[in-house]
Amino acid sequence: MDVSNETVERTDLRTPLVDPADTEVKPLPEVGLESVLTESSLSYRRRVYLGACIELKVLFRLALPAILIYLVNSGMGISARVFAGHVGSQELAAASIGNSCFNLVYGLMLGMGSAVETLCGQAYGAHRYEMLGIYLQRATIVLALVGLPMTLLYTFSYPILILLGEPKTVSYMGSKYIAGLIPQIFAYAVNFTAQKFLQAQSVVAPSAFISAAALILQILLTWITVYVMDMGFMGIAYVLTISWWVIVGSQCFYIAVSPKFRHTWTGLSWRSLQGLWSFFKLSAGSAVMICLEMWYSQILVLLAGLLENPARSLDSLSICMSISALSFMVSVGFNAAVSVRTSNELGAGNPKSAWFSTWTATFVSFVISVTEALAVIWFRDYVSYIFTEDADVAKAVSDLCPFLAITIILNGIQPVLSGVAVGCGWQTYVAYVNVGCYYVVGIPVGCILGFTFDFQAKGIWTGMIGGTLMQTLILLYVTYRTDWDKEVEKARKRLDLWDDKKEPLQN
């Protein structure tokens, strides 16, 4: 079938995107977007207006719950540190080290799980519903296998922390805290694959409600274990692990019993054991892409500890990074939404819809990020007092706010384009771009400006902004030059390989 020249059936634009009375998940292409964009009798402005009305409705329905999910997931780690801080300063340091160490496996599992977005999203758009369950099982197996060496690594966290120069007391307490978090590794393996399985079908709100309920449960149980059962900071670790497994169990139960998924989840299958290596290669590219992005800002904070006034530099940069991370969650929500939209439309053979979804999400996220950046500049002299009462730190934060504003704007574009890459299956290519822009250009230039030319924190941040800007411009150019008809054909070939029971490979 020639999908690039296929005539898409016109639908009534008054038809709602999702029929409230329908209990079965329906594919997104049958909503009129492609027919609007290809309707020659309508003027260009009219097509854009009607297409935007359709797309924005879908986009925000996906992005808002996704933003809530990522905020809640971050909130679980933050609440654990808050309780640890009330137990004692050493406990806070141990919990902070433990959570920071677990960001490694969190980013790894989140990145590998994003491969499910590519395959499930395209299979769903192409009406290959039975393959979604196969992809879900295969991804869970691969991530669980990757979790085994990570478990071994965290089991020996004490000597590793000592080797990294941490104090013995903090290293010992941190290693005990990490031991209580180890079961989370396998919770991540199931959670992120199940979450992407749901997102590929535009089912996002249930995960948001489950995550919010788990956060409330975590806060309640942590209070009980710390103040009633007197379990100390180890009780905080145990409750955090239990809370993640509550999320996993709730999502799996929802998938198993909901009639929405009777076509996409048909039970366990031996087919999930086929092609594990090929899936690992695709998911490894996703993991590298996301991990390199997550670690980039952390390196900025680490380098600040080497400056002339490390305490003030660390405090000011940590405050700026906290604000940046909060705004970044909005972009990550749009990242998830555009990944679903792009993969769905490519799988359905709708090149114009995939193109329109890409640029609509990019524009909306850019506008939001500019608004956030302007707010940061406007309140630059006051925002730091949310975190500290130190006037010197507040002054340093105010001086860094222009750099923070630029970072926020770039972070409003770059994650969305990364979401497009996931939807199209470009993870490995973007990983190479990230390595070059971040670690070959951004960090070395930042070190030269910060240490050699003595621009201190501003110099380091300038170099890293340069790396992010270069990466963003490359992704913008690649996305602009994309032949969406060819991407549709690639998606079709990737899915057609399953008819021969072969593994769909990344193009």
UniProtKB/Swiss-Prot annotation:
Molecular function, one GO term: antiporter activity
Topology versus the membrane, per the UniProt entry? Answer: Multi-pass membrane protein
Where in or outside the cell is it found?
Answer: Membrane
**Pfam families annotated for this entry?**
MatE (PF01554)
Listed disulfide bonds for this chain? Answer: none
Any one annotated GO CC term: membrane
Biological process (GO), any one = xenobiotic detoxification by transmembrane export across the plasma membrane
Q: Keyword 4Fe-4S on this protein?
A: no
Keyword annotations: Membrane, Transmembrane, Transmembrane helix, Transport
Q: Which InterPro entries match?
A: MATE_euk, MATE_fam
Which residue ranges run through the membrane? Answer: 58-78, 92-112, 141-161, 178-198, 209-229, 233-253, 287-307, 318-338, 359-379, 403-423, 433-453, 459-479
The Swiss-Prot or TrEMBL record describes its family as follows: Belongs to the multi antimicrobial extrusion (MATE) (TC 2.A.66.1) family.
Name of the protein this chain belongs to: Protein DETOXIFICATION 39
What organism is recorded for this protein? Answer: Arabidopsis thaliana
